[in-house]
Amino acid sequence: YITLQRSKTAREAIKTMAELVANYGYISSGESFSIADPNEVWIMELIGKGQEKGAVWVALRIPDCFVSGHANQARITTFPLAGKNKNSITSKNIDKLLKNPNIDCVYAADVISFAKNNNLYAGPDGQFSFSDVYAPVDFSGARACEIRVWAMFNQVVDGMDQYWDYATGRNINRVKPYVAGKAQTPENFPTNRMPLWVKPNEKVSVLDMMAFMRDHLEGTELDMTQDIGGGPFHCPYRPRPMGWEVDGVEYVHERATATQQTGFSFVAQCRPNTISEIGGIIWFGVDDAASTVYCPMYTCMTAIPLCFRE
């Protein structure tokens, strides 16, 4: 919220967030941020340093005409290193982010050295993977998180079948197994992860985005309306917890994009060819995204509508 108050562009937001965590620290676990303005969209992933002050992070600009997604699992893997790529900088030169429009990667200066100093990574700098070092994907990270990204990608681009076994957590390929507490090398990284972004077959609309939010894995073998848990009325809702055990066998409910415990969801629309007062719209909906009605909330609003205020 502080960043929203202080920033007018995605680049300013990244700089503000980086400076805030550097000055005041960051105690929370990892988080992924979609940061957009009318001209650019960035994805930034950030995780605290435990007992040390600050955070390690990476921010990448999503290329024009591409789409990306994240769902509670870090997704940035390797990234271009400063010094070897003129469009990449570290936090030491973060002021350049505002001055040079060609910069499309910026990261904490110690994102790799911190991992090495804390026995998290023992490989070459050029093969360092943010997600695989700081938030290694496991079964639940794939089945409950990555599968939601897969569901969206699968609706906009061909060829996503090749990532199905990965997204379901059935087959996370590694040359060598990941061992918690042991410094990783690139051989411990999955070799079949989904790309961070894909180029859609056609332009994605606001209505498409709303439809993605309503997904229950329909049309796949994990379609929540079709399995035994759906009952005779093909209900996509499942009680929590997501996992349980019977007679020594573990089972899981699917974690689709739309769930019954959602408090609110929204689709943010930035329109560069409209006056700024009404160019930004938050299509806001309360409760379950599958059945919500998305209502336009303009960025020029100074008061919350009574029906939402109550």
Which residues are covered by each model-predicted region?
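A conserved hydrophobic secondary-structure block that centers on an alpha-helix together
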Residues: T3-S32, P38
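C-terminus-biased signal that marks the final domain/tail of proteins
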Residues: I14, A18, S29, P38-V41, ...
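A short, sequence-level motif marking secondary-structure junctions
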Residues: L46-E52
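Surface-exposed ligand-recognition segments of extracellular binding domains, strongest
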Residues: A59
